[in-house]
A protein has these predicted regions:
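Residue-level recognition of the GNAT/N-acetyltransferase active site
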Residues: 2, 68, 72, 99-103, ...
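Acetyl-CoA-dependent GNAT
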Residues: 3-72, 81-91, 139-143, 149-163
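Conserved catalytic-core motifs of GNAT/GCN5-like acyltransferases
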Residues: 97-99, 112, 117-134, 147
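Short glycine/proline-centered loop/turn elements that form peptide/ligand docking sites
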Residues: 81, 104-107, 124-129
Length: 163
């Protein structure tokens, strides 16, 4: 993700989140090059999705991931999550975590394909609605078995979505 992508990112952010991040928050996150990575998915010149991950030692955390609602069900989220997990592995993580709304079953299904398992609930995590978050973890992401799982997931994606 670069500064020039922020207009497209913010358009998606405002569509999918009741309390969107500010452009300044994205810029701040993007400036932490040592342990954070932010990616965009594009169709032509249009930003259609984005995601971010931060790594501390052997743990990584997906900070955000979103796809333009007009482009749901096109495996864009799959590709973003694949690339974020690959980046976590590159940065030395052994495990990665995320939070997801308890009502967001579609995202939970996607995350479970990547080996994320629910480990707890954060009560009232989403302040704007009071909704709880499911905390999910994927362990042993550096293992050969997990890497094979990543390869199977991405090999089923359409050609334009593959690395």
């Amino acid at each position: 993700m670069r500064r020039r992508h922020l207009k497209g990112v913010m358009a998606i952010e405002r569509q999918v989140y009741p309390r969107p991040w500010s452009p300044n928050l994205f810029l701040s996150e993007m400036s932490e090059l040592r342990n954070r990575t932010y990616l965009v998915a594009k169709i032509g010149k249009d930003v259609v999705g984005y995601g971010g991950i931060m790594c501390y030692g052997e743990e990584a955390h997906v900070t955000t991931i979103a796809v333009d609602p007009e482009h749901h069900r096109k495996k864009i989220g799959t590709r973003l999550l694949h690339d974020l997990v690959q980046e976590a592995i590159r940065l030395g993580a052994q495990a990665t975590s995320l939070e997801v709304r308890v009502s967001n079953w579609g995202a939970q299904r996607l995350y479970s394909q990547f080996g994320f398992r629910p480990v707890g609930i954060r009560k009232n995590y989403y302040q704007e609605t009071g909704e709880d978050a499911v905390v999910m973890w994927a362990d042993n992401i550096r293992s050969a078995g997990y890497r094979e799982q990543l390869e199977r997931i991405i090999s089923r994606a359409p050609e334009g979505i593959r690395p």
